[in-house]
């Protein structure tokens, strides 16, 4: 049964994705439908988690907008994502960066990999 599921979902997986990890800063180009129009909206922030595998893999990006933390979870292989740009590579020692939710200002910075 599992082989059948992987065979069906294999054709729906995206292959043009950049490699990214928690701690990296991304710019996600999301297709947004407003009425009859479709436009691209940018969401830029730090990856705080990545979970799952295969077609159900998701990642969460966190940014601070007007002093309020905003987190958005995206499926990796959704057709709603037009493009993913990796802006910075972050050096972290955790897979889930939930501790960033409690940090403010300069303490919430992540070291960059040179």
Curated annotation (Swiss-Prot):
Question: Gene Ontology terms, cellular component aspect?
Answer: cytosolic large ribosomal subunit
For the keyword tRNA-binding, the answer is: no
Q: Which Pfam families match?
A: Ribosomal_L19
GO BP annotations, alphabetical order = translation
Residue ranges of coiled coil: none
The protein's GO terms of the molecular function aspect are: structural constituent of ribosome
Q: Tell me which domain of life the UniProt entry assigns to the organism this sequence originates from.
A: Bacteria
InterPro entries cross-referenced by the UniProt entry: Ribosomal_bL19, Ribosomal_bL19_CS, Ribosomal_bL19_sf, Translation_prot_SH3-like_sf
Which keywords describe this protein according to UniProt? Answer: Ribonucleoprotein, Ribosomal protein
**Does this UniProt record's set of keywords contain Ribonucleoprotein?**
yes
Family assignment from sequence similarity:
Belongs to the bacterial ribosomal protein bL19 family.
Question: What function does the entry list?
Answer: This protein is located at the 30S-50S ribosomal subunit interface and may play a role in the structure and function of the aminoacyl-tRNA binding site.
Any idea what this protein is called? Large ribosomal subunit protein bL19
């Amino acid at each position: 049964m599992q082989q059948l599921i992987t065979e069906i979902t294999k054709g729906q997986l995206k292959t043009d994705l950049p490699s990214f990890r928690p701690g990296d800063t991304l710019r996600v180009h999301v297709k947004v439908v407003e009425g009859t129009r479709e436009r691209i909206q940018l969401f830029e922030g730090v990856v705080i988690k990545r979970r799952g595998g295969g077609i159900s893999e998701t990642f969460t990006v966190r940014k601070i907008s007007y002093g309020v933390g905003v987190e958005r979870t995206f499926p990796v292989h959704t057709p709603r994502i037009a493009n993913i740009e990796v802006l910075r590579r972050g050096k972290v020692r955790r897979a889930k960066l939930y501790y960033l939710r409690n940090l403010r200002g300069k303490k919430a910075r992540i070291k960059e990999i040179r």
